[in-house]
Curated annotation (Swiss-Prot):
InterPro entries (UniProt xref): M14A-like_propep, M14A_act_pep, Peptidase_M14
Active site as annotated: E385
Family indicated by similarity: Belongs to the peptidase M14 family.
GO biological process, one term: proteolysis
Subcellular locations according to the entry: Secreted
Enzyme Commission code: 3.4.17.-
Name by which UniProt lists this protein: Metallocarboxypeptidase A
Alphabetized CDD domains for the sequence: M14_CP_A-B_like (cd03860)
Protein's job: Extracellular metalloprotease that contributes to pathogenicity.
pH-activity profile: Optimum pH is 7.5.
Broadest EC class assigned to this enzyme: hydrolase
Length: 422
């Protein structure tokens, strides 16, 4: 199976900050094929034989195959899957991307409000927005340049605290956009930052949360990959770090954490979307994030870590590396996951599934959740797959940003209230 990442090699083969012509997805279709016992092997063969990219690969029966089909292969693909049920996710992927990437201009110094969340934005505008947002609440927050990416971009963070003062409470850490193409996670983590700051002393639940925790929000964990999705290839997933003796750049940063690094839940192939890297923790951005998490943990410890992804509408607990092992805190993780999902659904009716990562989505090696729990000894370590379940997938329309933020905030507030209550 050809990786989505390999498409970008048509546009760029080196890791630089230079602007590259965007890969054109005009005429590409994204088609979902639900699998079952009698067709899963054939769907896998079609993907392999036609060398097709997937957003979701069906590793076993019952899993959906979300397949990217170029114009030149549509006839062959439709012939091979004749008689199978299909769902059209994107009739013209290029058109969907053009609609999604109609960014609204942002003027630095603007007082941030709900209008920010009516559009997606450029990487540089995100930096301006975060600094402007923090500037409105200087006594209860700080904007932090957490470190530099491989290409030298800022990895931004917002640090938020309440009545006890900075670094006086156990920390909550949220990560977004570790996978470059998951734009909704950037916006949703920023929506939560905006809410925690603007609703403090206005909303009792949010005030209690901010008073009880030191909150760290990293909306763009993978800035090089994120910027690349905006200039060159919308579907890029990995970072942009070169791989020696390999034509394919990039590591999957969520397979690069130095815990349970090797296994079937990651790949040793540099051209794979799930390439784990040459060594555990050798991703430039992973080194930055591990250093930051250790520094945060050295204060009052880390009460909770959540890594926000898309898509799938899932809220998951450890482990990723094993489908049979369970942490001693499994029951608590499951309880909080259900609380999150129930509160989220109450807002817009959006259903989320919950459960351990390996059993709920797929096996994952070298991931952030397992590392945080087992190496950093974070008390509660979780991950989410935000909207949707595949109707639009990674290319989620901008009109879903605000409802995604509203429901995710509600789930998060309910979950953190339960943590405070014990």
């Amino acid at each position: 199976m050809r990786s989505v990442l390999s498409l970008a090699l048509l546009a760029a083969n080196v890791v630089t900050a230079a602007v590259v012509s965007p890969f054109d997805y005009s005429g590409y279709k994204v088609i979902r094929v639900p699998t079952q016992k009698d067709n899963v092997k054939e769907v896998q063969r079609v993907i392999t034989d036609l060398n097709l990219d997937t957003w979701k690969y069906p590793k076993s029966e019952g899993q959906n195959a979300d397949i990217v089909v170029p114009p030149s292969q549509i006839s062959s693909f439709m012939e091979r899957i004749s008689g199978m049920n299909i769902e059209m996710m994107h009739e013209d992927l290029g058109l969907s991307i053009r609609n999604e990437t109609s960014f609204e201009a942002y003027s630095a110094g603007y007082a941030p409000d709900i209008n920010w969340f009516k559009s997606y934005h450029s990487y540089q505008d995100h930096l301006s927005y975060l600094q402007d947002l923090q500037g409105l609440f200087r006594t209860r927050s700080e904007y932090v340049d957490a470190g530099k990416s491989h290409e030298g971009r800022t990895i931004p963070a917002l640090h938020i605290w309440g009545s006890g003062g900075k670094n006086s409470k156990p920390a909550i850490i949220f990560h977004g956009t570790i996978h470059a193409r998951e734009w909704i996670t950037t916006m949703v983590t920023e929506y939560m930052a905006w809410s925690f700051l603007s609703q403090y002393n206005k909303n009792a639940d949010i005030t209690s949360i901010v008073d009880n925790f030191d909150i760290w929000i990293f909306p763009i964990v993978n800035p090089d990959g994120f910027a690349f999705t905006q200039t060159s290839n919308r579907l890029w997933r990995k970072n942009r770090q070169p791989n020696p003796n390999a034509r394919c750049p990039g590591r999957d940063l969520n397979r690069n954490y130095p815990y349970q690094w090797v296994g079937p839940g990651s790949s040793s192939n540099p051209c794979s979307d799930t390439y784990r890297g040459a060594q555990p923790g050798d991703g430039t951005e992973i080194k930055v994030h591990i250093a930051n998490m250790k520094k945060i943990a050295a204060n009052k410890g880390i009460a909770m870590f959540v890594d926000w992804h898309s898509y799938g509408q899932l809220f998951m607990s450890p482990y990723g590396y094993s489908c049979t092992a369970r942490p001693p805190t499994d029951a608590r993780h499951q309880e909080l996951s259900r609380i999150f999902a129930q509160a989220l659904k109450a807002v817009h009716g959006t259903p989320y599934k919950t459960g351990p990562i390996c059993n709920t989505i797929y096996q994952v090696n070298g991931d952030s959740v397992d590392y945080a729990l087992e190496v950093l000894k974070v008390k509660l370590s979780l991950t989410a797959e935000l909207r949707d379940t595949g109707a639009r997938g990674f290319v989620l329309p901008a009109d879903q940003i605000i409802p995604s933020g509203e429901e995710t905030l509600a789930g998060t507030v309910a979950m953190l209230k339960a943590v405070i209550q014990g």
